[in-house]
């Protein structure tokens, strides 16, 4: 896998401890973290419910369940599950973090996740607007984030006209 190749290349010249921090844009954060464990990475960066910017990171609770399958200790899992239910889920609902189809589409098309984050945080963007803008970004290139590109998409749907050229001026006085 790509994760295995990256770890192998790092370990050629680095003999110290290694770790991994994965994002969940395409739903592979856990898979890549497990692959890292299987390739002797020393630490895995994870967050409760995957809390993080945009689609988030490897979910601690999922990683614990995977490690439990490998006979690792996980006696504190019930405490973590209660913490999630009572504190993290309400925050997740309030601040709307986590994976969704828009982040996945962005990942498939090498679009910077800040585009998705910006549109999701703006109530004037409806799902069809977000999807249409992401389709546009997939054709013009969205690897580098730009507020201007989000504004263009927003203005397109709001019918805000920018510029001074008017076709009526071409036929005026004729």
Regions picked out by a protein language model, each given a short descriptive name:
Residues 1-174:
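Catalytic cores and adjacent flexible loops of soluble metabolic enzymes
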